[in-house]
């Protein structure tokens, strides 16, 4: 309630303002630049959306484009240091002053002083650098200026990860890589990638060549990511995966910043090198043993087998909040043959060939204060195996950081098992996770 004293004071103020705005006090000459006019524009505003390689407007089917969530966008007066051409440790640092991370729909907005700058857009080892002149007002960047590159061309400011792919027999991950522009691979063919890989991709096979890769740490160091998709037989490298010298190479590669992508029946590669983080649930024995995250030595008391039975998970769910928000904004082909908006809380995950009974935190060492540091595996997608006791809402896609700066991604499902146009939800999730496993590492233990 207002008092009468307050009313008198209010009227007095109104009277004083009326006098101040009269003809004797020219507070507004009618130009609109006075206290009631719009504030002057003093900054340059930069807007846009970051897109996945080869999946921007004009590249993907209308409405089925793939944005990049969590990409770093910033400006600098100097060109950034080049991304190393091989494996390296990228520890997390604060976001550059004035930099932003893109939203779930890939959008960003920067407000800076007008001038000429380097504009850097980066997600993991995907990076585009370009000079840009910014003047007062808003500049909206077109997709061709904000789409992550699918080639390694540092002299032109274009970077993408160097990858090795061990060619699977049932999971043609190279088709997904082809759809995001790796090499000249025909993304819809589900055919042999030989001759299509390009300089950014090196192909191996499980029969004999993969063994030489795993036995040569210097060859492994050439690649930021090594893909080990499902193979019906691991006999070509089974002996090597029981050899602690080879397993030490895998541990050393990850420790130095390397990323491993492993799916279903190829799980022995990760399970034998790092036995503790994931316990597989199907009939094959789970690996048991030890490993030292700093010396890379280890033991295997039980040599595991990741082979399991086929099932479809009708209740797939993106359990990471950022992944959930990102997937929920997208539209694309469905497993039933239609096209529609994805529900990140209920989608079908097909061609699972094992299930994860549980994940375990693993102590890696201590920090500078002497406190223990644990590797806590992270589930990105969950789902159920029908008819299997205890296999409800279990992790289907997991990442963990078992040593140093690197990461391991394991999925129970195959990603590409038949030719088709476009990208299904689990294939889009793969693209998201390829981006995520390249990001920096917090508090690595060496």
Place the predicted regions along the sequence by residue.
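Catalytic beta-strand/loop cores that center a nucleophilic Ser/Cys/Thr
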Residues: 302-419
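A glycine-rich, often tryptophan-bearing local segment used as a flexible ligand/cofactor-contacting loop or short
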Residues: 233-352
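Bacterial Sec-dependent N-terminal signal peptides
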Residues: 15-54, 129, 141, 145, ...
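Structural motif
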Residues: 49-68
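Extracellular ligand-binding/catalytic regions of CAZymes and related secreted enzymes
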Residues: 30-31, 171, 271-272, 278-290, ...
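Short, acidic Ser/Thr/Gly-rich low-complexity loop/linker segments typical of extracellular
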Residues: 77-107, 111
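Helical hinge/lid and interdomain linker segments adjacent to catalytic or ligand-binding clefts
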Residues: 164-278
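A short, solvent-exposed loop/turn motif at the edges and junctions
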Residues: 109-142, 147
């Amino acid at each position: 309630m207002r008092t009468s004293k307050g009313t008198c004071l209010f009227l007095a103020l109104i009277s004083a303002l009326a006098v101040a705005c009269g003809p004797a006090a020219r507070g507004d000459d009618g130009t609109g630049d006075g206290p009631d006019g719009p504030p002057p524009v003093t900054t340059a505003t930069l807007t846009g959306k970051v897109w996945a390689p080869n999946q921007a407007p004009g590249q993907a089917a209308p409405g089925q484009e793939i944005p990049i969530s969590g990409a770093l966008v910033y400006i600098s007066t100097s060109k950034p240091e080049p991304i190393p051409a091989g494996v390296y440790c990228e520890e997390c640092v604060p976001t550059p002053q004035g930099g932003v991370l893109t939203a779930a729909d890939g959008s960003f907005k920067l407000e800076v002083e007008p001038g000429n700058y380097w504009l850097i857009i980066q997600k993991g080892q995907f990076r585009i650098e370009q000079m840009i002149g910014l003047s007062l007002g808003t500049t909206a960047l077109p997709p061709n200026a904000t789409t992550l590159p699918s080639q390694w061309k540092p002299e032109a400011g274009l970077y993408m990860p160097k990858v090795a792919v061990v060619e699977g027999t049932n999971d043609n991950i190279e088709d997904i890589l082809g759809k995001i522009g790796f090499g000249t691979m025909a993304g819809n063919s589900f055919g042999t990638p030989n001759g299509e890989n390009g300089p950014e991709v090196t192909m191996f096979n499980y029969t004999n060549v993969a063994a030489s890769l795993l036995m040569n740490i210097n060859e492994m160091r050439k690649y930021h990511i090594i893909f080990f998709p499902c193979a019906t037989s691991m006999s070509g490298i089974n002996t090597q995966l029981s050899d602690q010298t080879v397993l030490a190479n895998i541990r050393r590669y990850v420790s130095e910043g390397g990323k491993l992508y492993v799916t279903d029946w190829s799980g022995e590669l990760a399970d034998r090198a790092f036995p503790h983080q994931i316990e597989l649930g199907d009939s094959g024995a789970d690996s048991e043993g030890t490993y030292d995250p700093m010396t890379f030595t280890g033991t295997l008391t039980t040599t595991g087998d990741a082979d399991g039975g086929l099932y479809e998970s009708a209740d797939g769910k993106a359990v990471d909040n950022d992944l959930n928000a990102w997937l929920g904004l997208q539209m694309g082909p469905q497993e039933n043959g239609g096209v529609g908006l994805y529900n990140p809380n209920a989608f079908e995950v097909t061609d699972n060939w094992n299930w994860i009974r549980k994940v375990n935190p693993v102590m890696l060492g201590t920090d500078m204060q002497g406190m223990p540091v644990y590797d806590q595996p992270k589930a990105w997608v969950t789902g159920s195996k029908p008819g299997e006791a205890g296999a409800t809402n279990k992790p289907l896609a997991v990442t963990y950081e078992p040593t140093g700066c690197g990461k391991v991604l394991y999925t129970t499902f195959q990603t590409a098992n038949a030719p088709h146009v476009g990208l299904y939800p689990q294939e889009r999730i793969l693209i998201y996770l390829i981006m995520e496993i390249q990001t920096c590492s917090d508090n690595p233990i060496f």
